[in-house]
Regions:
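HIT superfamily nucleotide-processing domains
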Residues: 1-138
Length: 138
């Protein structure tokens, strides 16, 4: 079965990354940690841990833009483990309003994890499965 991305007439996505709230907030540009022809990387304005970064593609090319962002996020996460003594990291995306997406331009979160950043790590076994409350346990 071939996977396709259906485009809706009432597509909620922005036309350009420059239309997103982070592009209009001067503070966001003060927090840029990397920029090249493909991606802007900056510190999240509402970080859940120290080092929480957003990877924002400059072009909207469906799967390609997100693939590039995941690759960058993975590389930065590995560097964080090696250089900043992070224990681990989560990489994630909220795709669509029902998934919690609030900025309607594709972007990837990379969240560093450290010992003690959650009360009982064994209780949250399953990681991202817990985005649906009480359904992540197995």
């Amino acid at each position: 079965m071939k996977h396709t991305t259906k485009m809706l007439e009432d597509d909620p996505y922005l036309d350009s990354y420059l239309d997103a709230p982070w592009a209009k907030a001067p503070k966001a540009y003060q927090n840029i940690v990397h920029e090249d022809e493909n991606v802007i990387v900056f510190k999240d304005g509402f970080p859940v841990t120290e080092g929480h970064l957003l990877f924002v593609p400059k072009k909207r090319q469906r799967r390609l833009d997100i693939t590039i962002c995941f690759e960058y996020a993975w590389e930065w996460g590995v560097k964080g483990i090696m250089n900043y003594k992070w224990e681990a990291f989560n990489i994630g995306i909220n795709n669509g309003v029902a998934a919690g997406q609030s900025v309607m331009w594709p972007h990837v979160h990379m969240i560093p994890r450290r010992k003690g950043d959650v009360e009982d790590p064994k209780r949250v076994k399953g990681g991202v499965r817990h985005v649906i409350p009480f359904k992540g346990y197995y």
